[in-house]
């Protein structure tokens, strides 16, 4: 199953890479976002899978027009990346009693 999932991610990324190598240089820099829409699409597919990644890329590409100001627009974190990790150091800091000073 993992091989199928990887293959499904590789195919659209290969098409995007062909665009980046052969078509984009002919058009020149046009994207109003950072990272560019094609880089965003590759990263979205890698982080979120083919279906959700293509959906995120489609939304991003639909915003890439002169009426939108553009700017920095990173790929959102995947659900597993957004969960806070169980970090014993941060837990110990949160569980320490606070000192109160009386005046």
UniProtKB/Swiss-Prot annotation:
Entries under Pfam families matching the protein: YidD
DNA repair listed as a keyword: no
Keyword Membrane on entry: yes
Cellular component, GO annotation: plasma membrane
Location(s) in or outside the cell: Cell inner membrane
Main location: membrane
InterPro entries tied to this protein: Membr_insert_effic_factor_YidD (IPR002696)
Membrane topology recorded in Swiss-Prot or TrEMBL: Peripheral membrane protein
Domain of life: Bacteria
UniProt keyword terms in alphabetical order: Cell inner membrane, Cell membrane, Membrane
Compositional bias segments (type: Polar residues): 87-103
Region (Disordered): 68-103
Similarity field: Belongs to the UPF0161 family.
Function summary: Could be involved in insertion of integral membrane proteins into the membrane.
Name of the protein in question: Putative membrane protein insertion efficiency factor
Organism: Idiomarina loihiensis (strain ATCC BAA-735 / DSM 15497 / L2-TR)
